[in-house]
């Protein structure tokens, strides 16, 4: 499979977990170019809209920063309306010939909603408050779901930070494009 396939993102893992009014997004720090590790401490998580929105990206870095800028403009136009801002961004993404060629995905969250903006310009709200993207996304997603289920069924005291760290550690042990240098941002209720 080609690394230029816009629906398969290589080189990162981004995980979002929501519990009650709190949400956390975690990302690893590895930047890969082909089979070489170029950087181990990249920050793929960013705060927007006066720190009321957190977002993480997978895919081409320059493309992701283009999307960050566009999303920030949409959030300024529609303050406090994350869903609307993301839908407007997705509309632009689908209409604009330049944007359609961007190779990036994003997870975006505020105090009330978490969303995945796909490489095809779709806006998806994940079930169960857990979402993941990137090459290690399915590993982190599976681990986070298992940890949340165990926490709920056994009444265990696990924080969002603990679950995110443990799930990202699982992804970093399986996915060669993901490392264990985890950066997290959280919005508390």
UniProtKB/Swiss-Prot annotation:
The active site is at 12. SUPFAM superfamilies: N-terminal nucleophile aminohydrolases (Ntn hydrolases). This is ATP-dependent protease subunit HslV. It comes from the Bacteria. It is an enzyme of class 3 (hydrolase). One of its GO terms (cellular component) is HslUV protease complex. Signal peptide: none annotated. One of its GO terms (biological process) is proteolysis involved in protein catabolic process. Na(+) binds at residues 172, 175, 178. GO terms for molecular function: metal ion binding; threonine-type endopeptidase activity. It catalyses: ATP-dependent cleavage of peptide bonds with broad specificity. Belongs to the peptidase T1B family. HslV subfamily. Keywords: Allosteric enzyme, Cytoplasm, Hydrolase, Metal-binding, Protease, Sodium, Stress response, Threonine protease. A double ring-shaped homohexamer of HslV is capped on each side by a ring-shaped HslU homohexamer. The assembly of the HslU/HslV complex is dependent on binding of ATP. InterPro entries: ATP-dep_Prtase_HsIV_su, Ntn_hydrolases_N, Proteasome_sua/b, Proteasome_suB-type. It is found in: Cytoplasm. Protease subunit of a proteasome-like degradation complex believed to be a general protein degrading machinery. The gene is hslV. Its EC number is 3.4.25.2. Allosterically activated by HslU binding.
